[in-house]
């Protein structure tokens, strides 16, 4: 059994039920870790509704209202650090709130116990844009399992954030799947226009591009088969996977 840490804000509310349902198929120690404010300083008022509605014996919540973490990277790292203390197993899967595993496939992968041989393991993922049935033909990477004993504060608070978990040791595996089947699904940009605007206002890549203009142009028309983030090509799914 592994613990699961989910970095969450109410910007990811539409994914929350699915990620909890899927993670519950392979873990009984799920920690949802949040900051009381978005990265732009606005109070995350949506947390109260989620916590009061969703808290159960298998899901714990850690909410930090201290405003201790000032930089974007420290905020990301701090959310994970706060949750580690609540994890009861020797291995922890770190997810963002829009990274949803196929719970049945993950359970089968974990039952092999190959991950126990390594300090860290990451996963291939499908990547989606605008709607959950627009899936990029290019694979990406998300989700990292790490041995808990490695997770000192110096280790967690690193410039590379959670990807430091695979960068600082030679004993890791990247881009894992189960018998060729992709386990992880990243719905980062599956959002309405308003949700995308909220996302780019309060995340660590705010200054990378003129996101507002790109979003306005994107929603001035139907989806044209390419995203403005990576420029991937897409397939249209007949049914939503998770």
Regions inferred by a protein language model and the residue ranges of each:
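Cell-envelope/extracellular polymer assembly enzymes that use nucleotide-activated donors
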Residues: 1-5, 29
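Short, conserved active-site loop motifs that form the nucleotide-linked donor/cofactor pocket
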Residues: 2, 57-60, 118
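Short, well-formed alpha-helical segments that are part of the catalytic scaffolds
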Residues: 11-26, 30-34, 39-45
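Residue-level detector of structured alpha->beta connecting loops
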Residues: 27-28, 88, 117
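Active-site acidic Asp-centered loop
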Residues: 35, 95-96, 122
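Active-site-proximal specificity loops/subdomain of glycosyltransferases
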Residues: 35-91
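Catalytic-site signature of metal-activated, phosphate-bearing donor transferases
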Residues: 69-84, 99-242
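Short beta-strand-to-loop acidic/aromatic patch adjacent to the donor-nucleotide binding site
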Residues: 89-102
């Amino acid at each position: 059994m592994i613990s699961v840490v989910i970095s969450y804000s109410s910007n990811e509310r539409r994914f929350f039920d699915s990620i909890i349902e899927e993670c519950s198929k392979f873990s009984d120690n799920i920690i949802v870790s949040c900051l009381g404010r978005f990265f732009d300083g606005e109070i995350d008022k949506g947390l109260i509704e989620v916590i009061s509605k969703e808290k159960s014996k298998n899901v714990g919540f850690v909410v930090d209202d201290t405003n201790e973490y000032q930089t974007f990277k420290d905020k990301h790292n701090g959310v994970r650090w706060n949750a580690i203390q609540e994890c009861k197993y020797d291995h922890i899967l770190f997810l963002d709130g829009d990274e949803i595993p196929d719970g049945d496939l993950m359970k089968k992968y974990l039952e092999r116990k190959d991950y126990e041989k390594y300090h860290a393991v990451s996963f291939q993922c499908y990547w989606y844009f605008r709607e959950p049935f627009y899936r990029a033909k290019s694979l990406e990477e998300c989700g990292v399992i790490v041995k808990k004993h490695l997770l000192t504060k110096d280790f967690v608070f690193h410039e590379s954030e959670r990807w430091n978990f695979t960068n600082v040791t030679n004993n890791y595996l990247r881009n894992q799947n189960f018998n060729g089947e992709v386990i992880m699904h990243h719905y980062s940009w599956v959002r309405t226009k308003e949700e995308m605007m909220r996302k780019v206002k309060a995340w660590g890549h705010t200054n990378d591009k003129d996101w507002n203009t790109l979003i306005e142009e994107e929603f001035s028309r139907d989806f044209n088969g390419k995203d403005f983030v990576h420029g991937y090509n897409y397939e249209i799914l007949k049914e939503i996977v998770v």
